[in-house]
């Protein structure tokens, strides 16, 4: 018998990619459908997986100030719509991967007495998952440090943060690059881009190019034109500037050093593929969770952490150049990252979902 599984999340790739990594585990083994925000990027991201998508009229509440009342009203409407979707699709379980988009479907599932599970990617749980943890039948964590936040330990499982199979495959292709002479810098601002990181790199292009550093730069859609113009001033180079990188596995494999934000999925992927990094956490992330995420890689010696408020005082470009000039440190950072990569998370979450469904079937 095929189970019917509803997956719900949205907002950013940091939530959606772990959800899709788990969806990969159920290929041909379950009927899947995806519930997210009709305003987020998730509908497009899910298309390539051929999973039916249902959109809800919800936006985030935190940081919206006077618009929060409107957002809360939309959430109530979304719960009503989510109930109708669940009535139509009749899932055996609803699995949420955080963000405001997951709240309505999981509440609706509880109202309909459908089993639920949630996965938390960050060291510091987001608002939606903190509220939903009381209702969920299972709570999956990316890092054991988060365990103390949840009071009902019997339903909590440490699974790791699911990553895409193409990224997992790179874990086994890891190579010691101490004899390599390449200077490949991968610049990432997350799925939505990062203007601060983009500006740091554009302002430092002259120094980077003079040190023979080749760059692949994901700018985000909204800042692409500006950044592209910055690179164009230097004529033909081997560097690439794109709004979004579709094949992240290939980009990681190409890179020697990564400059990026510190979203939970990025941290998990950096560890899995064994890439040293310079991390500039997004300073306005809820509860500053990106800083807590970054500290994991810093503690094990795999990353350098630079708060965005310090980028004026700290010469980020000089840090990049110094690491490329110190191959021993760069390799040791890569080895430390690779050692702490967890690649079985998607399988663990999938197995826990099956266990929960089996237990409920026996009741």
UniProtKB/Swiss-Prot annotation:
What is this entry's stated membrane topology? Peripheral membrane protein
Task: List the molecular function annotations (GO) for this entry.
Answer: UDP-N-acetyl-D-glucosamine:N-acetylmuramoyl-L-alanyl-D-glutamyl-meso-2,6-diaminopimelyl-D-alanyl-D-alanine-diphosphoundecaprenol 4-beta-N-acetylglucosaminlytransferase activity; undecaprenyldiphospho-muramoylpentapeptide beta-N-acetylglucosaminyltransferase activity
Keyword Signal assigned: no
Report residues binding UDP-N-acetyl-alpha-D-glucosamine. 12-14, 122, 164, 191, 245, 290
Q: Name one Pfam family in it.
A: Glyco_tran_28_C
Per UniProt, which keywords does this protein have?
Answer: Cell cycle, Cell division, Cell membrane, Cell shape, Cell wall biogenesis/degradation, Glycosyltransferase, Membrane, Peptidoglycan synthesis, Transferase
Q: Where in the cell is it found?
A: Cell membrane
What PANTHER family has UniProt attached to this entry?
Answer: GLYCOSYLTRANSFERASE, UDP-N-ACETYLGLUCOSAMINE--N-ACETYLMURAMYL-(PENTAPEPTIDE) PYROPHOSPHORYL-UNDECAPRENOL N-ACETYLGLUCOSAMINE TRANSFERASE 1
Annotated protein name in UniProt: UDP-N-acetylglucosamine--N-acetylmuramyl-(pentapeptide) pyrophosphoryl-undecaprenol N-acetylglucosamine transferase
Which species is the source of this protein? Lawsonia intracellularis (strain PHE/MN1-00)
């Amino acid at each position: 018998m095929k189970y019917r599984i509803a997956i719900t999340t949205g907002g950013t790739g940091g939530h959606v990619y772990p959800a899709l990594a788990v969806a990969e585990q159920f290929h041909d083994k379950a009927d899947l459908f995806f519930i997210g925000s009709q305003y987020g990027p998730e509908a497009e991201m899910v298309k390539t997986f051929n999973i039916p998508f249902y959109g809800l009229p919800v936006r985030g509440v935190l940081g919206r100030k006077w618009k929060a009342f409107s957002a809360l009203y939309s959430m109530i409407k979304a719960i009503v719509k989510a109930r109708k979707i669940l009535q139509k699709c009749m899932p055996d379980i609803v699995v949420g991967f955080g963000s405001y988009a997951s709240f309505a479907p999981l509440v609706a599932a509880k109202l309909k007495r459908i089993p639920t599970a949630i996965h938390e990617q960050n060291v510091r749980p987001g608002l939606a998952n903190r509220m939903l943890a009381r209702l969920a039948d299972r709570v999956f964590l990316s890092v054991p440090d988060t365990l103390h936040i949840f009071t009902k330990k019997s339903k909590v499982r440490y699974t790791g943060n699911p990553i895409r199979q193409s990224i997992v495959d790179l874990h086994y292709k890891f190579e010691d690059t101490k004899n390599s002479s390449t200077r490949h810098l991968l610049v990432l601002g997350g799925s939505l881009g990062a203007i601060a990181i983009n500006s740091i790199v554009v302002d430092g292009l002259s120094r980077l190019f003079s040190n023979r550093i080749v760059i692949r730069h994901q700018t985000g859609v909204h800042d692409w034109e500006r950044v592209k113009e910055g690179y164009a001033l230097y004529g033909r180079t081997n560097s690439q500037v794109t709004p979004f990188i579709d094949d992240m596995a290939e980009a990681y494999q190409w890179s020697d050093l990564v400059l990026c934000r510190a979203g939970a999925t990025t941290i998990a992927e950096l560890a899995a593929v064994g890439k040293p990094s310079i991390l500039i956490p997004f300073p306005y992330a809820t509860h500053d969770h990106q800083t807590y995420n970054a500290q994991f890689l810093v503690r094990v010696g795999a990353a350098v952490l630079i708060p965005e408020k310090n980028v004026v005082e700290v010469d980020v470009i000089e840090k990049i150049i110094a690491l490329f000039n110190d191959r021993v440190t760069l390799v040791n950072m890569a080895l430390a990252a690779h050692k702490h990569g967890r690649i079985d998370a998607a399988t663990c979450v999938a197995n826990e979902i099956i266990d929960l469904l089996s237990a409920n079937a026996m009741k």
